[in-house]
Structures are given as structure tokens and as C-alpha cells.
Amino acid sequence: MSLYKNKIVITGGSGRFGSKLKKIKNKYKLLFPNKHKLNMLNLENIKKYLKLQKPYYLIHLAGLSRPMEIHEKHIDRSIDLNIIGTANITKVCAELGIKLIYFSTSYVYPGTKCNYK
């Protein structure tokens, strides 16, 4: 599949970091699909969207911003989006030869509880 070097798909465009990227002027065509256009839990949907858009890069920002809070009450949402969704994006990018850039922020884990620093 021939990819467009000036096109970048960005997941999580409505989040804190993604919303900042929307304001940056640059030479790239940035696409910010919402969860209805790019359903990270549906491999076929991801493939269809990425084959249609043919981005050279995918910047993966989507995820629950406070998973520890949500994890306590809704473990399935935390696992679906942060683990399965990310795995699906990774798998399809690898299959289609799309370069994946993955970010995670400090809002994911507060650094005050458990045995990490």
C-alpha cells in the first residue's frame, strides 16, 4: 500500500495533548478521527479507515486519562481502551507499514500509590 508521507492520523484528538496538536500549524495533513470513525476495538474498522486514509504516521494518544480511578469501578473499560485498543492499533499499523508513535502521559498513573516512582 502506498502511503502519503504528509498525512498523519492522530487518535485521542479530543484529549489534553491531542487538542493542543490541533492548534499547531505545519506542513502535514493531520487527521483526528473520533471514536465513531476509528473504533479501536474493531480491527476491521481500523484497517478500513487506515487503508482509506493511507497515513505515513499514526500518533496514538487515545486512552483513559485516569485509568486507576476508572479501573476500580469499570475494569472492562480500562482494559478495552488502554490495552486492547492500543494492541489493535499497533497490530494494524504493523500490518499496513504505518509508522506508529505512541504517547502516554503522567495522568495515567499518579506516581503516589503502589510500588512505582
Each predicted region: which residue ranges?
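N-terminal Rossmann NAD(P)H-binding glycine-rich loop of SDR-like oxidoreductase domains
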Residues: 2-26
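Rossmann-fold scaffold of SDR-type NAD(P)-dependent oxidoreductases
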Residues: 11, 56-61, 102-103
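Glycine/Thr-rich phosphate-binding loops of Rossmann-like dinucleotide-binding domains
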Residues: 18, 68-69, 110-111
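Short, well-ordered alpha-helices that flank and scaffold nucleotide-derived cofactor binding pockets
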Residues: 19, 23-27, 48-51, 91-95
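Adenosine-cofactor binding site in Rossmann-like domains, unifying the SAM/SAH pocket
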Residues: 26-49
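NAD(P)H-binding glycine-rich loop region in Rossmannoid oxidoreductase-like domains
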Residues: 43-81
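Conserved internal alpha-helix in NAD(P)-dependent oxidoreductase domains
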Residues: 76, 80-87, 95
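Conserved Rossmann-fold NAD(P)-dependent oxidoreductase catalytic core, especially the SDR/UDP-sugar
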Residues: 87-117
